[in-house]
């Protein structure tokens, strides 16, 4: 069925078609609904690291894009008040004192004083719904700004968490490289002694030097990447470049299996960017209603009452009042109003297509995130096995070398394999963290609107 039904279209928006989408029962084809969903948890429940929690809270408080989004919400809330006030009568008052001096031929100058005080009220009778549609549009823009702010929050939480775990992984990789570099340095010393003692040829010695030099060359690049990542996090947190306090990457902790492959499609209603797109669609529909109403007459009723006299002592002896019925109607504008109405319909169609595209993109993002998460969980397990096997391989190679069964080149190969396995395992743990972040973001986790708040917003 249609994603949602547009309410109260009437004659004004009868050409506004609903989004044409047939939403599947589950996000993953052939999947099933799961009662325990990652999106049901707040971000503070997902990321237990206290340093990361503090960093996220600081980012949500100080990030300039976040502050801009909050200011936009406040702006549109005030603008909605302006538009809503147009539906009610407006009251005004005016007091005045005029004096005119004039002279006819040779006669004495004449002074004409005029004192007045009047109050009035005016009200536009909204026969064709122009003001009501404008109010609906302002409400939609305001609610859309709230959802956009939530989307910004969701994006920032994901961005900070991603950068934090990438930084921790770089720290861990640097530790591995430094430890391996020291191992290769010791290997160079031993290989040189064996070569100079005539126990081996020069080849193992040169090979050990190559391994040491290539490993040492990785250090400056990693140190640079760490500094750049710290600068990125500082920018997200609304600060100047500085060092970032962080924990070590825990390669032993694993995320629990918080979700299965079948996630109910209703969870996509959590996505604030999708909800913002829905509000933009409602605002475009309201613009159609305003353009339709502008093709018809406007009726304004006003009433003015006051007192006026030319002497202050008799000021209250000259009361007056009068009503005014003002009817303004477009007569002949060479099709301008009709063209504006038709243009607003096409603007609505653009928003509708963009909304449909956004829904498709959201389904794709969630499918991609689920695939990435499943793959990352499997890979980190396999990389852990590879690291364990590589460690045992090094131990066995050293034992066999010491007993004369293999050459020193075989030991170097085993140590090189173990080094690569350590790096790959560290990166796979990082990728699992990033995958859970991506899935959490794709599901719109942590930013669902309470039911009571949703009902209030719709009134």
Where are the model-predicted features located?
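Outer-membrane beta-barrel pore domains and translocons
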Residues: 94-100, 122-124, 170, 211, ...
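Periplasmic alpha-helical coiled-coil/stalk elements that build and connect Gram-negative outer-membrane
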Residues: 131, 140, 147-263, 372, ...
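Terminal intrinsically disordered/low-complexity segments used for targeting and assembly
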Residues: 1-61, 139, 223-269, 442-459
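Short segments within alpha-helical structural elements
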Residues: 185, 213-242, 376, 384-443
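Sec/SRP-type N-terminal targeting helices
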Residues: 67-68, 84-85, 125-153, 203, ...
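Short flexible linkers and secondary-structure junctions
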Residues: 10-161, 298-303, 324, 334-341, ...
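Short sequence motifs at beta-strands and strand-loop junctions characteristic
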Residues: 109-113, 317-319, 420
